[in-house]
Amino acid sequence: HSTAWALLGVGDEDFDPEALRRLRELLSTGGVPLVAELWSQSPDFTLPGALWRVYLFREWFHRDPLTVADLYILGLHAEQVPGLEEPIHARPLEDVIHDADALLSGEKRDDDLEDIFTELAHAMRIVAAGDPRVGRQWIDDPHDALAYGVTMRARALVMTAQELERAASRARIGELD
């Protein structure tokens, strides 16, 4: 929990200003996977759990941007995107990912969490609607570096979107642990 809050510039007894500076330096030099691994076992209703889900989606996009972008475009043109009202007003996927990158590099604050989590949840729902194999796992290969319970469950994108929406709601009312 301390590293997740420190990422947002919120120190505690474990993270004084110097420790915050070092963490941000680690993140800016490619240390996000190391820190994100610490969050992988955290429940979805906590900040580290939500950040873990942000990290996984962002990594999938950076690894396979064409596939994710194609599914996003297909989803935008789907007859229905479960969980989103019509008409769909969605930001460009690249902008949503840019915000995720900024969040995970320590450039955002806790006031930004609700919007970022909500936008990422919308993006996940849109990508899921663009996938003709609805109900499939997000990551199919158990040896994939992104293969975790979150990504290998049936309907992973929709379920992860729901979890991020819950985290956004908790962030809005100041109850995100």
Predicted ranges, named:
Residues 1-29, 34-36:
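Leu/Val/Ala/Ile-rich N-terminal alpha-helices, chiefly Sec-type signal peptides and the beginnings
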Residues 71-168:
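Helix-driven interaction modules
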